Amino acid sequence: MGRGRVQLKRIENKINRQVTFSKRRSGLLKKAHEISVLCDAEVALIVFSSKGKLFEYSTDSCMERILERYDRYLYSDKQLVGRDVSQSENWVLEHAKLKARVEVLEKNKRNFMGEDLDSLSLKELQSLEHQLDAAIKSIRSRKNQAMFESISALQKKDKALQDHNNSLLKKIKEREKKTGQQEGQLVQCSNSSSVLLPQYCVTSSRDGFVERVGGENGGASSLTEPNSLLPAWMLRPTTTNE
């Protein structure tokens, strides 16, 4: 059978208690040294006997340095804990403030909408009225400004369109003027060419001969062709149109 579990309790016999303390103290100091060497850990062990006698072990015999490090660790840990507690309290307080602020804003919103007015006093109603009047004035001022800006933009657009139309009309007039000048030049050229051409007048005589009057020399010349060779309608005098 295996060994049963030993129940830990105070040893009543004084001698047995001292012997057990001596054995276990030596084992504890040995274990502390082993863990310090094997694991490269800083170990500080302090043991007081029932009579108040001190037994200790420290890595590299630097008990004070290890204890100072322990104190610094405890202080920083307490600071962190205190800071966390303080921040938690601040968050709780800030949440309460924000919640109250939201409630006030929601109440003001309902009042501006004309709701929940029964609970307001005369002074609060007058203050609400002044706030609404100021808001209406601000809205009207902004509306008038927006209308003025819109009208100004439309006027600028209208002026730009008028300038564009005037430019188009000017171009059309210039083109018409140029076209008229070209037509006038063509008419003058036509008139001058018709003046330079010689004018002739063909007449018929009773003898049956055709006579041509005019020409470059302004004289008359007779054609010797007999009348029988030309029809009568070809013997009509010709006229020139200027």
Curated annotation (Swiss-Prot):
SUPFAM superfamilies: SRF-like. SMART domains: MADS. GO terms for biological process: cell differentiation; developmental growth involved in morphogenesis; flower development; fruit development; maintenance of inflorescence meristem identity; positive regulation of flower development; positive regulation of transcription by RNA polymerase II. One of its GO terms (molecular function) is protein dimerization activity. It comes from the Eukaryota. Residues 88-178 form the K-box domain. It is found in: Nucleus. Keywords: Activator, Coiled coil, Developmental protein, Differentiation, DNA-binding, Flowering, Nucleus, Transcription, Transcription regulation. Residues 3-57 form the MADS-box domain. The keyword Nucleus applies. Gene3D superfamilies: Transcription factor, MADS-box. Residues 89-178 form a coiled coil. Vascular tissue of cauline leaves, floral shoot apex and valves of carpels and fruits. Induction: Dramatically up-regulated upon the transition from vegetative to reproductive development. It holds the Pfam family K-box. CDD domains: MADS_MEF2_like. Disruption phenotype: Altered cauline leaf shape, abnormal stem development and architecture, including enhanced branching, decreased inflorescence branch angles, and shorter stem and internode lengths. Reduced stems elongation after bolting. GO terms for cellular component: nucleus. Probable transcription factor that promotes early floral meristem identity in synergy with APETALA1 and CAULIFLOWER. Is required subsequently for the transition of an inflorescence meristem into a floral meristem. Seems to be partially redundant to the function of APETALA1 and CAULIFLOWER in the up-regulation of LEAFY. Is also required for normal pattern of cell division, expansion and differentiation during morphogenesis of the silique. Probably not required for fruit elongation but instead is required to prevent ectopic activity of IND. PANTHER family: SERUM RESPONSE FACTOR HOMOLOG. Homodimer capable of binding to CArG-box sequences. This is Agamous-like MADS-box protein AGL8. The gene is AGL8.
